[in-house]
Amino acid sequence: MKQSVFVQQQGVECDFTGSTPWVILSPIEQSIKQKIEAVGTPLKDWDINIYRGVLTGYNDAFIIDTEKREAILANCQTEEERKRTAELIRPILRGRDIRRYGYKWADKYLIATFPSRHYDIELYPAVKRHLLSFGKERLEQTGKTYSINGEKIKARKKTHNKWFETQDSISYWEDFNKPKIVYPNKYMPFVYDEANFLTN
């Protein structure tokens, strides 16, 4: 079979028969990859954990700006509630906030009601009021579609979590309090975070 000019110029021979992972690279790229692998330790052999950021299922309700955070805290009835609530609302770095070797924090906060923490929403009435302002049906984790005042409202995906909790359990929430490397999912700028940001 005759090969096209493009295949003749750009084609690369690859061995897919081995048990090692394969990748299609030019000979120069293959050489660079082999040199890196010869001196480096594969990521799978490092003693680290790799996690994804927080999935809320509805960022409009759970990710808030400084003004909204202050309003929620101002609506707390006691100093004890205010302190609890302030600990629950944590700074977050979103993927779009990460730049090459740094970040530009957008003054955003996450209402960090992780299911693995087993929060009692009744201890956070100001947060409860804020979340309910988006409609309980919208925040439920049933996957159902509701019709309210002629408008179709889609609930978050079905889970066993409560309506006020983030979508994923985040059992590794304590690791957000450790230094970590953070990167977005669309492109690869990395930043080393020692400020205990949550990420999404």
Name each model-derived stretch.
Residues 3-200:
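Polybasic, glycine- and aromatic-enriched phosphate-binding surface used to engage nucleic acids
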